[in-house]
């Protein structure tokens, strides 16, 4: 196991949840349910409210593979929008182009999806893009660049992930033409619960 996998494994154990949504980490949590450095029935130290908020924020950062600055900016945008700030925050994260590539099964992980976008393999509304943080809107269409080797790679990824991941209802995936259409923004109940978004809102609200 390489250093990157070890680091991810430690994060999963620290948070007690499979934030990377990959089967091998479910197995790890079953085998080692305690956080790194804690063995047996040792009691966790009492966590402050701030500590709890920080943990939830970190879950989201590592889940989506974004920086502190990126998450801060996404929170500010979520707060400007109408509706519930926490719901808006998660919807914005889900509509990142790298996340949609991941959700569609075009990539085996979000890190892989970021790489695919960064390398210019994905087209957005007919134009090549290389920025993983682009936020997609309703009726946007992404597709794989016209190159046989790239299409072969993506089709292989779709096959690998088809039994592991359920396609979101707010996107339409054409596996034959390798394109994805955003039909609408996701609602809160369509987004997997990996963190308590209200605690994240409270964390940033105190620092605004």
Swiss-Prot record:
Residues 95-157 form the S4 RNA-binding domain. Keywords: Ribonucleoprotein, Ribosomal protein, RNA-binding, rRNA-binding. SMART domains: Ribosomal_S4, S4. GO terms for biological process: ribosomal small subunit biogenesis; translation. GO terms for molecular function: rRNA binding; structural constituent of ribosome. GO terms for cellular component: small ribosomal subunit. Signal peptide: none annotated. Belongs to the universal ribosomal protein uS4 family. One of the primary rRNA binding proteins, it binds directly to 16S rRNA where it nucleates assembly of the body of the 30S subunit. With S5 and S12 plays an important role in translational accuracy. Part of the 30S ribosomal subunit. Contacts protein S5. The interaction surface between S4 and S5 is involved in control of translational fidelity. This is Small ribosomal subunit protein uS4. It comes from Borrelia hermsii (strain HS1 / DAH).
């Amino acid at each position: 196991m390489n250093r990157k996998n070890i680091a991810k494994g430690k994060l999963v154990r620290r948070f007690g949840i499979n934030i990377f949504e990959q089967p091998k980490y479910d197995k790890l949590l079953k085998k080692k349910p305690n956080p790194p450095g804690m063995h047996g029935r040792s009691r966790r130290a009492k966590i402050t409210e701030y500590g709890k908020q920080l943990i939830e924020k970190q879950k989201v950062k590592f889940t989506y593979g974004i920086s502190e600055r990126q998450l801060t900016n996404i929170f500010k945008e979520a707060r400007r929008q109408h509706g519930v700030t926490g719901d808006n925050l998660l919807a914005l994260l889900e509509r990142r182009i790298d996340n949609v590539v991941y959700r569609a099964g075009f990539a085996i992980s979000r890190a892989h999806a970021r790489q695919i976008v960064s390398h210019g393999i994905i087209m957005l509304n007919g134009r090549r893009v290389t920025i993983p943080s682009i936020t997609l809107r309703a009726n946007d269409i992404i597709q794989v660049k016209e190159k046989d080797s790239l299409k072969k790679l993506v089709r292989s990824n779709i096959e690998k992930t088809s039994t592991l991941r359920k396609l979101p209802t707010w996107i339409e995936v054409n596996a034959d033409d390798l394109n994805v259409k955003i039909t609408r923004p996701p609602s809160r109940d369509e987004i997997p619960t990996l963190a308590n978004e209200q605690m994240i809102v409270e964390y940033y609200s105190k620092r605004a």
